[in-house]
From Swiss-Prot:
Disulfide bonds: none annotated. This is Glutamate-1-semialdehyde 2,1-aminomutase. The modification N6-(pyridoxal phosphate)lysine is found at K268. It comes from the Archaea. It comes from Methanococcus maripaludis (strain C7 / ATCC BAA-1331).
Amino acid sequence: MELNIKMDRSRELFEESRKYLVGGVNSPVRSFKPFPFFVKSAKDCFLYDEDGNEFIDYCLAYGPMVLGHANENILNAVKSQMDLGTAYGVPSEKEIILAKEVINRIPCAEMVRFVNSGTEATMGAIRLARGVTKRNKIIKFEGAFHGAHDYVLVKTGSGALTHGAPNSPGIPEDTTKNTLLIPFNDEDAVKKVISENKDEIACIILEPVMGNVGCILPKDGYLQFLREITEENGIILIFDEVITGFRLSKGGAQEYYGIKSDLATVGKILGGGFPIGAITGKKEYMEQFSPNGQIYQAGTFNGNPVSVTAGIETLKNLDDKFYKETTKKADILSSFLRETAEKYNVPAKVYNVASIFQIYFNDKEIVTYEDAKSSDTEKFMRYFYTLLENGVFIAPSQFECCFTSIKHNDEVLEKTMNAIDIAMKKL
């Protein structure tokens, strides 16, 4: 498909990139046909590509940039830290400062282990749960994405689903034989799997809001049900809040829904645009990590001073006003999407929570992975391309979600709604 915008330089760079980088990208979610645009710079809620195009950004690097791109406070703090060093290999005070902030915000957090990504965080949390319970099996939900590691890369969402590989080759069957898959929002399926695997399940890991298969919300009472059934059966409940952490509220999904998990993983927003992840939870579990316990977890860049500095500066700015404003922006866009789809008789379902939203081109309610997969992905890509031609960038997949930042102002929202109207009319 040829886009009706100037992308000559991006085309050149993509052709060169394909010679050196697999598929021309470093993560499959960044790939779309005929080729992705190449960014030269970013500021506030805008991306500027190598051809001079300006795009309003609702992808926000897949979530982290809640304060907008190139935030001056974060940049100044990071520059000051870089003058003091970029990696130490020994502890620094800032690690304590950020850990305290995490503990003050996240309901289940009593101790923290910083890592370098959401993938590392979920991998470590699952290992911890298995070590603590001395059980091997885990429950994950169909379509949930918990990073690109072998324990959970089965029937997953995000780029794996977009590019047709929800079950990755290269993972031995023995690795995933202990990964039990069930549909999201299905209480009976949870009860059945637990009863069939009595005293064998170490943990249930879930995205409280499934943000890697669009935006699938938990049914009323579902998270409370999971909390109760895990407690009854000695199963550790892990909330993967890499997306929802610090986005739904100060305390993430746990605070937003009033449910306290045993362990939680966070990332994205926590790093303010720099690589980071964290495992957090009950002290009695967390202290089983080495050096206090026998469960090994380590990393050269764990608690990296640059990432930690950016995290401290980011969390300083996430107050009640921030959440009220970013939620309002997502509410406005979600309402407009519903109204415009109805106006042009486009079958669609729109879901939003706090500053997360997504549209599915489907006439059925989306409550599971299978529901999401039944959506019209070809229509979604036509919608995506028309938005792009009109200066709006969203993730190029039906199975990702959109985000608002504090920098999406009224003028930006108006331009976005104009682009949405054009896109819906063309469908």
